[in-house]
């Protein structure tokens, strides 16, 4: 499986834990540029990845207001589509915010699924849309928990800014949520760029306590981990992909 826009590899990690062999493509985080990358055709069974989503998120309006249009991240979904077309895999999976346009790749039928991290055993309320493309239009049947936490943690923010209450049914008021260890916390948390905040983000994303990003500043660590797919969400999707491919 080829991973595009891998970042620190959280989606890759989830797929690897479900038995896939993942090869990481270039990422600006490590000095690579997707725009100059051309994957070989016919070498990969699948392609996964989540192009930067800021342009389609609610954060975009804030960035425009404060910094101007030129500071809003570019739409790189077309680069993802180009790489899929060049690689010609059996299947592809794109992770994005719900508001982003779906990938349109000639020769593939795309099925979409909205998934919230807490629905599949995760700790957070993060909601993402997964677009699964195959030649024959296979569905993506993601297993969801019958019962899950009614007050999940707010999604980890790449900005390291204020954690806002985005739990299901949230109306903007502060709520009590719980840490992964069961302790209560307020729905509003100031995201100071501290090592403690990073450790909380590591836990919220479903990573082991020992997880670290040596060589990065704390602010860079928080940004990188906030851009990643929570492990529970990634594993649920990876399992669904595997089962879809194995279904005759």
Predicted regions and their residues:
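Class I SAM-dependent methyltransferase "Motif I" SAM/SAH-binding loop
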Residues: 3-8, 225
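Conserved acidic E/D residue at the C-terminus of a beta-strand in Rossmann-like folds
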Residues: 5, 24-29, 95-96
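Glycine-rich SAM-binding Motif I of class I
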Residues: 8-9, 13, 232
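Class I S-adenosyl-L-methionine
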Residues: 12, 16, 36-46, 53-194, ...
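A generic secondary-structure signal
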Residues: 14, 82-86, 240
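Adenosine-cofactor binding site in Rossmann-like domains, unifying the SAM/SAH pocket
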Residues: 16-40, 114, 206, 212
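C-terminal target-recognition/interaction regions appended to catalytic cores
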Residues: 148-248
């Amino acid at each position: 499986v080829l991973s595009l826009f891998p970042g620190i590899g959280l989606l890759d990690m989830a797929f690897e834990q479900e038995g896939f062999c993942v090869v990481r493509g270039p990422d600006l985080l490590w000095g690579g540029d997707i725009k100059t990358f051309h994957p070989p055709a016919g070498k990969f069974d699948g392609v996964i990845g989540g192009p930067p989503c800021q342009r389609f998120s609610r954060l975009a309006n804030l960035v425009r207001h404060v910094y101007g249009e030129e500071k809003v991240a570019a739409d790189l979904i077309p680069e993802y589509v180009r790489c899929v077309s060049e690689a010609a895999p059996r299947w592809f999976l794109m992770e994005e915010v719900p508001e982003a346009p779906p990938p349109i790749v000639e020769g593939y039928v795309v099925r979409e699924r909205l998934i919230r991290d807490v629905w599949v055993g995760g700790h957070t309320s993060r909601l993402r849309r997964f677009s699964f493309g195959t030649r024959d239009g296979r569905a993506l049947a993601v297993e969801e928990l019958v019962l899950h936490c009614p007050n999940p943690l707010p999604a980890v923010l790449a900005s390291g800014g204020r954690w806002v209450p985005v739990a299901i049914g949230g109306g903007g008021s502060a709520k009590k949520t719980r840490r992964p260890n069961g302790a209560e916390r307020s729905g509003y948390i100031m995201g100071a760029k501290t090592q403690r905040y990073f450790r909380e983000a590591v836990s919220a994303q479903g990573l082991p306590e020992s997880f670290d990003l040596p060589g990065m500043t704390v602010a860079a660590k928080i940004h990188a981990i906030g851009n990643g797919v929570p492990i529970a969400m990634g594993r649920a999707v990876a399992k669904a992909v595997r089962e879809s491919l194995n279904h005759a």
